[in-house]
């Protein structure tokens, strides 16, 4: 059992806490801020532009070498990785407290830049956490360490995506206090990080004479993929597969608020119960991919995750009720998780084992970068099409990927 292992190995407990801290900012950007803005009367077209902060998670691969090769002055006395973790967690605490002092109804400029800063600091924190985890554990225990980190990440998202909404409601929408408390959690986490043991490794310094070989190392995985048949077509299928779902997710929380659901209902049903539906759906998605080949599994889960968007059209016509939201979240999260599992499985299959890490990063970065960029305009589409028209549009967005997969299913034997 994962929980038993965590309590037996203190290193896993450290990774659990770091995972929790890693997951907290993402839920703030995805959910908490959008709910706050919606209740403050900010237009949906403006709310979704805050999603630009998510781009840091897609682009972090470009500054991750800095985390490997440069130390933070003074703070690195506690360790190379810990220096970056302490810096990021301290700054995130200050950013969150500053965010709570802003008034969205009066001015959005400062809050906008603070949100972008939070995304950048959070993604940088993630890089350092992953590096610390990989450094601390032996090869045979990397699996349990990764599972612990993911478990903690989910808890962190529940804290700021669920508990924070509930706390804001019971304090009469005192968002300043809510963000202050979250900021204090990050401040306390900074103290904890100082106590974490870091395994110091001998790191090779960058040499200018090795730049040519470094470029070759980076480019080779890309050349390997693009040499294969239908490479561009496959890449487009990966990019479009989750686009409709990403568009839907970007406006979901403001949509619930507009329908009249309370923050506590969103916290309990969408975040807490929704996590259970997601876990079950992910498991079933794995079975589907095992039972069918890659393309057929993707087509099945792709169709399911797109048609479940009709549930939101149905929800839009219902008076606010616990049961209606529960049904919608069950259907949507279950199918979306099936699609995510299928996509991860397919991407993993596509990777050449010789270049697995870089090629996997290529696919995930291409997909998330496209999704995070396009979803910025989701609010404008809602204003143009209305809620039901927007939901139909998200269903249509899934069609290119499905048509491409059907085509590839006939052409490629995988």
Swiss-Prot record:
It is a multi-pass membrane protein. CDD domains: MFS_AmpG_like. InterPro entries: AmpG_permease/AT-1, MFS, MFS_dom, MFS_trans_sf. PROSITE patterns: MFS (PS50850). It is found in: Cell inner membrane. One of its GO terms (cellular component) is plasma membrane. Keywords: Cell inner membrane, Cell membrane, Membrane, Transmembrane, Transmembrane helix, Transport. GO terms for molecular function: transmembrane transporter activity. The keyword Transmembrane helix applies. It holds the Pfam family MFS_1. NCBIfam families: 2A0125. This is Putative transporter AmpG 4.
């Amino acid at each position: 059992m994962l929980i038993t292992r965590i309590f037996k190995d203190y290193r896993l407990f450290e990774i659990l806490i770091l995972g929790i801290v890693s997951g907290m900012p993402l839920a703030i950007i995805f959910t908490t801020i959008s709910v706050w803005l919606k209740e403050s009367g900010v237009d949906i077209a403006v709310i979704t532009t805050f999603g630009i902060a998510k781009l840091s998670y897609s682009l972090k691969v470009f500054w991750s070498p800095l985390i490997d090769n440069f130390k933070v002055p003074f703070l690195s006395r506690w360790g190379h990785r810990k220096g970056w973790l302490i810096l990021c967690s301290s700054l995130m605490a200050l950013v969150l407290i500053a965010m709570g002092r802003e008034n969205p109804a009066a001015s959005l400029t400062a809050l906008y830049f603070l949100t972008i800063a939070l995304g950048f600091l959070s993604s940088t924190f993630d890089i350092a956490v992953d590096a610390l985890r990989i450094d601390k554990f032996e090869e045979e225990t990397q699996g349990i360490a990764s599972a612990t980190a993911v478990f903690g990440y989910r808890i962190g998202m529940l804290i700021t995506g669920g508990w924070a909404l509930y706390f804001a409601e019971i304090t009469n929408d005192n968002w300043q206090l809510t963000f202050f408390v979250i900021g204090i959690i990050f401040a306390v986490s900074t103290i904890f990080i100082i106590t974490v043991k870091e395994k110091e490794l001998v790191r090779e310094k960058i040499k200018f004479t090795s730049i040519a070989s470094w470029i070759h190392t980076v480019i080779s995985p890309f050349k390997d993929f693009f040499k294969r048949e239908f490479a561009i077509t496959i890449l487009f299928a990966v990019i479009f597969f989750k686009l409709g779902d990403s568009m839907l997710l970007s406006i979901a929380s403001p949509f619930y608020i507009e329908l009249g659901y309370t923050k506590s209902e969103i916290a309990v049903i969408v975040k807490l119960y929704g996590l259970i539906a997601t876990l079950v759906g992910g498991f079933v998605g794995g079975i589907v991919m095992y039972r069918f080949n890659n393309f057929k599994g993707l087509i099945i889960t792709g169709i399911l995750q797109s048609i479940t968007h009709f549930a939101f059209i149905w929800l839009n016509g219902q008076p606010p009720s616990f049961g209606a939201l529960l049904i919608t979240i069950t259907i949507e999260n279950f199918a979306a998780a099936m699609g995510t599992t299928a996509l991860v499985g397919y991407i993993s299959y596509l990777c050449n084992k010789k270049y697995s890490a870089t090629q996997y990063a290529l696919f995930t970065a291409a997909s998330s970068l496209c999704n995070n960029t396009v979803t910025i305009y989701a609010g404008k589409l809602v204003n143009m099409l209305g809620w039901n028209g927007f939901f139909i549009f998200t269903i249509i967005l899934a069609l290119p990927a499905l048509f491409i997969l059907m085509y590839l299913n006939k052409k490629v034997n995988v």
